[in-house]
From Swiss-Prot:
Organism phylogeny: Bacteria, Bacillati, Actinomycetota, Actinomycetes, Micromonosporales
Keywords associated with the record: Ribonucleoprotein, Ribosomal protein, RNA-binding, rRNA-binding
Gene giving rise to this polypeptide: rpsK
GO CC aspect terms: ribonucleoprotein complex; ribosome
UniProt protein name: Small ribosomal subunit protein uS11
Region (Disordered): 1-22
Subunit structure: Part of the 30S ribosomal subunit. Interacts with proteins S7 and S18. Binds to IF-3.
Start-end of Low complexity biased regions: 1-11
Entry similarity comment: Belongs to the universal ribosomal protein uS11 family.
One MF annotation (Gene Ontology) recorded for this entry: rRNA binding
GO biological process terms held by the UniProt record: translation
Length: 135
């Protein structure tokens, strides 16, 4: 005899992953001094897949390396290609070391890279920058 559900017990809803069929999209690469985050979106800006150097498995100062950015871009691109992504326009933001490496790895995985734009925000004399490092 199967066990009966208790009265008032919460029923867990399982959310199934839906497969979006998007052939063309955008790759947003945010490369800071400490990490690199790659988000792949559809043309309207809704995120399809993302990956970061920390999510791929790097910790501490190794997150800021070009190799970590390469693995993060590959992981995000593979996940986006499962949803049918074939071509991306790349938007790069930030001064980090993983900018070019991430773009190259998007191409190496098999995504066709269209235009590449640098959308790094430039202050019009806004916030005071961090003090100079004394090493």
């Amino acid at each position: 005899m199967p066990p009966k559900a208790r009265a008032g017990a919460a029923v867990k809803k399982v959310r199934r992953k839906e497969r979006k069929n998007v052939a063309h999209g955008q790759a947003h690469i945010k490369s800071t001094f400490n990490n690199t985050i790659v988000s792949i979106t559809d043309p309207t800006g809704a995120v399809i897949s993302w990956a970061s150097a920390g999510q791929v498995g790097f910790k501490g100062s190794r997150k800021s390396t070009p190799f970590a950015a390469q693995l993060a871009a590959e992981a995000a691109a593979r996940r986006a290609m499962e949803h049918g992504m074939r071509k991306v326009d790349v938007f790069v933001k930030g001064p980090g070391s993983g900018r070019e490496t991430a773009i190259r790895s998007l191409q190496a995985v098999g995504l066709e890279v269209g235009q590449i734009s640098d959308v790094t925000p430039q202050p019009h004399n806004g916030c005071r920058p961090p003090k100079r490092r004394r090493v």
